[in-house]
């Protein structure tokens, strides 16, 4: 049985993370198939590193995006890394759109097993490189849209693409995750045992116009054990990527992630204080 909570934005937290990232650095690493991977690295300004937070963008995204997430994680003491995924980045989307409409082109890309295999290699290369910069073994995988699907598969979600995740991160944060559909079938998330935070919005509609409520499927299907679901009032899909009038969504997202991380240090993974603008369910 889960509990329902409502959240409102805290100005103190806004001041705590806005512009706090110690520094951004562009790095190129090599993955296991010898292809190069572009990373945006946000060092923490704190004395000790709490762990690595790897951010996987949505289809068409790049290592240059999601700065609000990276800065938020850096402010909390994590080495934050935004990963560029060549097989599903901007150029890959452009190629898919040639001769296809937007919906069909993106649908083909986000259901391409090879694109996910490339993502897993990118993430593994970023994680390996991070060991030289952070002496803490703790690790978090965050993903938006296709990056959320990547994180769910890595966490152990069964899928229709024939992919198997290694479940190597300590916890997962997924923004705009997919529900039952082309990627995931019914009961796909039953085996996920690690802590998971899901965040979506009431205007975060699926590709093709499907209701945002399909994004609740993973939470409803996962077993209890430090699973959180946050729903932000009026947040759109692209707000989570930092586009549009997104500041409010960004602040609530980072604030909720902070509360989720703090809950890991408490007995029972206790939920946050009630705030305006977001509803939190836990189980």
Q: Whereabouts are the PLM-identified features?
A:
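Serine-hydrolase catalytic machinery in alpha/beta-hydrolase-like enzymes
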Residues: 29-135
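Primarily recognizes the serine-hydrolase "nucleophile elbow" in alpha/beta-hydrolase
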Residues: 126-191
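Bacterial N-terminal signal peptides that target proteins for export
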Residues: 1-9
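The feature captures the conserved acid-bearing segment of alpha/beta-hydrolase catalytic domains
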Residues: 164-234
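Bacterial N-terminal signal peptides
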Residues: 8-18
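Boundary at the C-terminal end of the N-terminal hydrophobic targeting segment
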Residues: 21-23
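Glycine-rich His-Gly loop
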Residues: 55-59, 145, 201
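Alpha/beta-hydrolase-fold serine-hydrolase catalytic core, especially in secreted/extracellular enzymes
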Residues: 234-235, 242-283
């Amino acid at each position: 049985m889960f509990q329902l909570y409502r959240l409102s934005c805290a100005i103190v937290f806004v001041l705590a993370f806005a512009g706090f990232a110690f520094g951004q650095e562009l790095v190129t690493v090599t993955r296991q198939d010898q292809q190069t991977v572009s990373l945006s690295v946000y060092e923490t300004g704190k004395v000790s590193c709490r762990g690595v937070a790897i951010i996987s963008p949505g289809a068409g995204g790049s290592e240059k995006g999601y700065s609000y997430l990276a800065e938020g994680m850096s402010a909390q003491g994590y080495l934050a890394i935004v990963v560029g995924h060549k097989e599903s980045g901007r150029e890959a989307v452009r190629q898919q759109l040639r001769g296809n409409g937007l919906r069909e082109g993106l649908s083909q890309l986000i259901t391409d097993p090879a694109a996910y295999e490339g993502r897993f290699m990118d993430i593994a290369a970023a994680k390996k490189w991070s060991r030289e910069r952070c002496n803490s073994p703790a690790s978090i995988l965050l993903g938006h849209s296709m990056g959320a699907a990547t994180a769910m598969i890595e966490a152990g979600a069964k899928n229709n693409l024939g992919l198997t995740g290694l479940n190597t991160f300590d916890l997962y944060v997924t923004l705009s995750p997919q529900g039952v559909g082309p990627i995931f079938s019914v009961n796909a998330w039953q085996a996920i045992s690690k802590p998971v935070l899901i965040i979506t919005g009431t205007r975060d509609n699926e590709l093709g116009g499907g209701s945002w409520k399909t994004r609740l499927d993973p939470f409803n299907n996962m077993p209890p054990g430090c699973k959180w679901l946050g729903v932000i009032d009026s947040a759109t899909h692209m707000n989570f990527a930092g586009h549009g009038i997104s500041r409010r969504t960004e602040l609530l997202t980072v604030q909720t992630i902070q509360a989720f991380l703090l809950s890991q240090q408490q007995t029972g993974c206790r939920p946050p204080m009630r705030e305006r603008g977001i509803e939190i369910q836990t189980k």
